Structure formats: structure tokens, C-alpha cells
Amino acid sequence: MVPIGLDDDLARRRPPIVSAGHTLPSYSLESLTMIDHFALGWVTPILSFLLSCAGCAVGLTCTARARVSHGIASIGWLALGAVSIGGTGIWVMHFVAMLGFHIRGTETRFDVPLTIASGLLAIAVVGLGLFIIRTAGVGPFTLVAGGTVTGLGISAMHYLGMRALHVGVEVTYDIPTVFMSVLVGIVAATAGLWLSAKVHNFAAGVGATIIMGVAVSGMHYTGMAAMRAEVVTGTVIVPDGGVSVAALLGPLIIGVTISTILLLLVVGLAPSAAELEAQEKFKGWQGRQEEIQREAAEPRRRSQLL
């Protein structure tokens, strides 16, 4: 596989590049360490932000219904919220943003098992955070604890996803920037968990969605800013492992489309949070009326016995 995007005048008489048993020309160090996070222009950051907002919006709708549900129904809504926020709002946003990532002179390939594992991790940690808030309440301690656990998990998802990249060069990270990205992730997760427990109307939901989309995107690009690429021993091995972006794009589009349609169907067909709350109030009122009727009937029953 020949490196892409290099002009002939960049070639240098350096040690050869080896790929799948073939000897290829070598290139200058500068051409191989140029990282471009926006190789496709503003398409990927805007699209990834919109997808993040969409996932967070559906997720907030699910968590709102979890608040007014009980038992298995509440757990089910929390699970759907975790899939929406962790899957679409965070992981899909990360992957789509990575479509614009390119190191000049190399081809980006993905380790499929690690890529899938990063998505499952995102869903799991968001689900854990939502469960903590749902069961323990939105106190300062639980909010900080849930936000920290979820933020660390999201950061782990990001760097696991980066570990899944095969780029043919040595990748290192600027430690202070890594810590900054983790901090951003914790703040974003804490804000998201707080919003998941507090959003009650459409206007607040729109604002919360935008805040969460900005926070998730900010964490991703802060983490990407920590990345450094270096040539190993003066040569570059063109990556042969993993699969290409094009090979993953089709399954990703199909998977996201199907899951989004299913989520929207569930959310659309199920009662809204307001309707569920009204049902709970009606059940409470009905129970009180039955109790009043029983109390009113008790004197008559006693008189009949006498």
C-alpha cells in the first residue's frame, strides 16, 4: 500500500519503507508527522456535533421518562438513554470526527474489535452514571462521583478508540493536554448527568442538548490536540492491519440509521414523560378515592353486623 497525498519532490534517500513484503520509497520526516484533524474541512466537526446533539436529545428524553417510571420500566428508559447518549451522542460523534483525521503520507486504518469495544465502553459508563443519579439522587457527592466515574470512562473510550488506529507511525501524547482532556470529560459528564435529572421542558431540553454537544466535541478535540506522531527509526511501515475507513463507513451508517429509527419509534410510540407523570398522579388519586370509599363503607358494614 503506497502512502497517499505526497508529491514526488518530497521523496528522500532514506531507509526504505516496508509493507507486506514490498519496498516502497521513503519520505521526509516533516511530510509524515503533519497531523490534520480537519482533512475534510468543516464537514466532519459540524456533522459530528449535530449527531452528538441528536443522540443527547433522544437520551435526555429517555432519562426524563425514567424519572417518572418505576421498576423495570425505569431501568429500560435508563438503558435507552445510555445507548442514545453514550452510543450516538459520544461514540458516533468520536468516530465521525475521526473521518476528518489524517496524517500526511499515511493511511488511517481501524482495529475493529477495539473500535467496537470503545463504543460499548461509552454506553456502559454513561449507563452507570445515569443509574447512580437515578438511585442516589442529585446531591453534590453523587453528582461529583457519577460525573467523575463517567468522565473517566468517556476519556478511556476516547483513548481506546485512538489505540484502535493503525497509522504506520509512532503515536505519542502530550501529557498535560491529556490531563486537560480528561478534566474536560469529567466536567462534561457531570454537566450531562445534572441536566439529565433537571430538564423538564422543551426549551431547557434544547439548551441542554447544545451544551452537551459542545462539551462532548470539546473533550474529543482537546484529546486529539494531545496527539503527536513520530517516525520510528527513520522509517515508516505502511499499516496493513485493521480495515480502512471506507470499509467501516457502510456498516456504521447502516447501524446508526437502524438504531436511531428504532429509538425514535420507541420514544415516539411510548407515552411522554408528562403523560407518564399524569398517569402516576391519576393512579394516586384513584387509590385515594378507593381508600375514602372503603372508610365510608366501614360504618355501614359494622352496623349490618350488629
PLM regions and their residue ranges:
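Peripheral, non-catalytic segments of secretory and membrane proteins
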Residues: 2-10, 18-306
